[in-house]
């Protein structure tokens, strides 16, 4: 029996850890809370290189004789504090992008690949393309998500009433922006409510500076949506699409959480982003074949590590 430990579910890494737990029909425990049982066969924790957080996770070690640890990164290089993870001999990452960066900077750790997982869904057909709905899911206040540039590109398209942009915010505080043609959905949604967001939208857009993975786009692909992505980070390993926005690699330019201003990430081409939005809108693309994404999800279900104990 597995125990999965992670942060609150509004956090992206909380969601992906919970999805692993759902895959194995196992318990998900939010860090800081007590597990339901006294002991488990194996534990899984998604960790970031923050000493206080790592000390919290260490309090769970007694519940499981064996642990699997995972982390992620979005810049090159990464913060030196990732060296704190050397307390773990092996750490899994969800993309080759992350593995190559971390392996180069911290060779003492064994970095192994374990893809993120989400359940494949039977796509629900959208009955109308008027208005044509673009959408994106994530922490829209996070500068890495580059949402203001997405809004600017969308407004330059001048779709007027023929299109709409829906932003599902996964922020800890409500976002009250007032932008014509843009709807912001705040708060943690139930699975059924989130499914409705997918079902009533047409085209998913990710224009992040970088993604360790970018599960919103992956989940849209698993619902056969057309997806616009950027080419810096791990997302392009998960989603194959003709609507890829090229990035120029360069410094972030400011300090933010684990990011330093001298670290590099991608700067998406706003002209190409706008062109991709216009192309999907003009062609009214509402479905796309994402066989590659589905195959990756199937591979995750067969990961040998899951079989090291019963679920």
Label every model-predicted segment:
Residues 79-80, 113, 117-132:
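Acidic anion/phosphate-binding donor-loop and adjacent secondary structure
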Residues 226-229, 243-244:
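Short hydrophobic beta-strand element within catalytic cores of glycosyltransferases
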Residues 3, 27-103, 192-193:
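Extended catalytic core of nucleotide-activated donor transferases of GT-like folds
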Residues 172-195, 203:
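Nucleotide-activated donor-binding/catalytic signature segment of Leloir-type glycosyltransferases, i.e.
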Residues 209:
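Aromatic "clamp/platform" in nucleotide-sugar-dependent glycosyltransferases that forms part
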Residues 125-145, 151-155, 165-166:
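Conserved donor-binding/catalytic core segment of Leloir-type glycosyltransferases
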Residues 265-274, 281-311:
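A charged, aromatic-enriched C-terminal amphipathic alpha-helix characteristic of glycosyltransferases
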């Amino acid at each position: 029996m597995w125990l999965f430990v992670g942060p609150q579910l509004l956090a992206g890494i909380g969601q992906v850890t919970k999805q692993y737990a759902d895959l194995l029909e196992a318990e998900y425990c939010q860090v800081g809370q007590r597990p339901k049982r006294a002991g488990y066969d194996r534990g899984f924790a998604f960790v970031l290189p923050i000493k206080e957080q790592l000390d919290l996770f260490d309090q769970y070690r007694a519940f499981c004789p064996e642990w699997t640890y995972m982390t992620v990164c979005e810049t090159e290089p990464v913060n030196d504090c990732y060296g704190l993870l050397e307390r773990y001999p092996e750490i899994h990452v969800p993309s080759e992008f992350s593995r190559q960066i971390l392996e180069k900077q911290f060779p003492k750790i064994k970095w192994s690949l374990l893809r993120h997982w989400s359940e494949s869904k039977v796509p629900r057909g959208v009955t109308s393309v008027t208005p044509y709905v673009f959408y994106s899911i994530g922490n829209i206040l996070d500068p890495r998500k580059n949402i203001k540039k997405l809004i600017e590109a969308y407004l330059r398209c001048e779709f007027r009433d023929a299109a709409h942009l829906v932003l599902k915010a996964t922020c800890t505080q409500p976002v009250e922006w007032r932008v014509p043609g843009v709807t912001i959905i705040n708060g943690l949604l139930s699975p059924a409510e989130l499914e409705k967001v997918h079902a009533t939208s047409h085209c998913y857009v990710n224009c992040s500076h970088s993604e360790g993975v970018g599960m919103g786009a992956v989940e849209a692909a698993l619902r056969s949506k057309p997806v616009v992505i950027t080419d810096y980070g791990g997302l392009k390993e998960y989603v194959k699409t003709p609507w890829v926005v090229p990035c120029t690699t360069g410094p972030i330019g400011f300090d933010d959480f684990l990011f330093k201003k001298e670290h590099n990430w991608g700067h998406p081409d706003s002209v190409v982003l706008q062109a991709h939005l216009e192309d999907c809108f003009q062609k009214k693309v509402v479905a796309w074949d994402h066989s590659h994404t589905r195959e990756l999800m199937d591979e995750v279900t067969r990961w040998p590590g899951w079989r090291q104990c019963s679920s």
